[in-house]
Structures are given as structure tokens and as C-alpha cells.
């Protein structure tokens, strides 16, 4: 293992951000694919919030946080057949010697949460 990250957010916080900032908020945080998926759901705000939490958790697991090394939209969360899929720049994964990122996401009526684990190729880390 290299790192673990977790995050929890109130779904209403994402709802308020969207109603305040609209597409500007969406386009800063989420890829077009993420937006399309979330707005195809009956509760898009829960889907957006769980992806927001997942991006935070992934950035913490990698040890970079969101900022200069890793931008919001460089992390893409998509639906896999059995579990969520995480895409981040290959160059960053190579630099950190990360071979894969495991992700678990969940939400209820009020909160969304995610846990990410980054596995390294070199067991000495």
C-alpha cells in the first residue's frame, strides 16, 4: 500500500454550490462524462457529491491533494462493471509508482463518502 484517503460531504453543499455557481461550478470540478452520468440519475446531487468525495479521497491517497500537482478534472470517476473506476494522469501514477487505485463510494439521503487506496508497484514504499 502507498496511501489511503477518505472524504465525506453533505449532499446539500453540492446542491447549493450548483444553484449558486451553475455550470461554472460543474465545469471546474467534473468532466463532461461525469456530468452526463450524474444528471441522468434521479438525484444528480447525490451522484455529484459522491464523485466530489471520491476525487478528494483519491487526491489524499496519492498524497498530492487537489492543487498544482493534480487538478479536479484530472481525476475522473466512472462506473465500472463491479466497482468504480478511477482515471488520473499516467505520468503522475508513474512518478508516484502507483499501479492502481481502489475506490469505494457510498451515499445516503444527507451525506456522500468515499475511501481510496493507492497501491504501489514497489513494496518498499
Swiss-Prot record:
It comes from the Bacteria. Keywords: Cytoplasm, Fatty acid biosynthesis, Fatty acid metabolism, Lipid biosynthesis, Lipid metabolism, Magnesium, Metal-binding, Transferase. GO terms for cellular component: cytoplasm. One of its GO terms (molecular function) is holo-[acyl-carrier-protein] synthase activity. Its EC number is 2.7.8.7. HAMAP family: AcpS. Transfers the 4'-phosphopantetheine moiety from coenzyme A to a Ser of acyl-carrier-protein. This is Holo-[acyl-carrier-protein] synthase. It comes from Chlamydia muridarum (strain MoPn / Nigg). The gene is acpS.
